[in-house]
Regions:
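Conserved mid-core segment of classical short-chain dehydrogenase/reductases
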Residues: 13, 108, 113, 121, ...
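Active-site helix of classical SDR
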Residues: 165, 199, 207
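Short, flexible catalytic-loop segment of classical short-chain dehydrogenase/reductase
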Residues: 204, 225-236
Length: 290
């Protein structure tokens, strides 16, 4: 685990900056903290195997590093951010675990099925599925949101989750865990992120429903609801002036770092949460989710 003192978590203002979607970690200022130097494992996932979508950067990278240091092998699913993915894989292998990189489009059911098969081929088992990849875009007016944009957001954020769970669940043993990344937007939607926020509400509902649907198989399903977290999504989807003050409206007065969520994903994947399923766990810097 990391301590707060170990994590680099600067308060705003951040420098105004903007990137093309989906963004690159190496171009962010300040650099995000994924727990590279702070996360210390304790063997809580020893011998496990995980799939992490969006594992190339941001929260996904922090989770991959933490899982590896807790003893898990990791398949890192990503779209086309090859440099970021290679860097995440480097941290996993430095922890002494296997890292498998698979690029492709999770909007396609066949690719989601391939991810599960690749994990089973590489690791011989699948214990943890982290549905973390997301598409986000900000719009000033409702009329600016195209039907294509709405469809892409739902196919990336929601449809892929269904495809992956459907492919993975029959191959997972009792005691396995599924962890979905929702958002504070599930309960407190940002109007300029209408499509994204709507999908995050759907993910919270999907999590609660699926948890009940497959409880008799001994597989737990939970979700994490991050608040403002400093990831490549921010400078690549928000205007520069919004980036500058990002996270300043939380009671803690700053954005969270990806490393500050990793421990929650570890807890939900491990036996520490053996009586938790269907939960939505907020990590929001003090912003309430009631």
């Amino acid at each position: 685990m990391s301590t707060t003192a170990d994590i680099k978590a600067p308060a705003p203002p951040q420098p105004q900056q903007q990137q093309k979607m989906p963004g690159a970690t190496s171009h962010m200022n300040p650099s995000p903290d994924h727990g590279e130097t702070s996360y210390k494992g304790s063997g809580r996932l020893q011998g496990c195997a995980a799939i992490i979508t969006g594992g190339d950067s941001g929260i996904g990278r922090a989770v991959a590093i933490a899982y590896a240091r807790e003893g898990a092998d990791v398949l890192i699913s990503y779209f086309d951010e090859h440099d970021d993915a290679q860097e995440t894989a480097r941290w996993v292998t430095e922890a002494g675990r296997k890292a498998i990189l698979v690029s492709g489009d999770i909007k396609q059911e066949a690719h989601c099925q391939e991810l599960v098969e690749r994990a089973l081929e590489a690791f011989g088992r699948l214990d943890i599925l982290v549905n973390n990849a997301a598409h986000q875009a900000s719009f000033a007016k409702l009329e600016d949101i195209s039907a294509e944009e709405w469809d892409v957001t739902f196919r990336t954020n929601v449809h892929s989750m269904f495809y992956l769970c459907k492919a993975a669940v029959p191959r997972m043993e009792p005691g396995s865990a599924i962890i979905n990344t929702s958002s504070i937007n599930a309960k407190s939607p940002s109007p300029t992120l209408l499509a994204y926020a709507t999908t995050k509400g759907a993910i919270a509902n999907f999590t609660a429903g699926l948890a009940q649907f497959i409880a008799d198989r001994g597989i737990r399903v939970n979700a994490v609801a991050p608040g403002p977290i400093w990831t490549p999504l921010i400078p690549s989807t928000m205007p520069p002036e919004a980036v500058e003050g990002f996270g300043g409206n939380t009671p803690l007065g700053r954005a969270g770092q990806p490393a500050e969520l990793a421990g929650v994903y570890v807890m939900l994947a491990s036996n520490d949460s053996s009586y938790m399923t269907g939960a939505l766990v907020p990590v929001t810097g003090g912003r309430p989710m009631l």
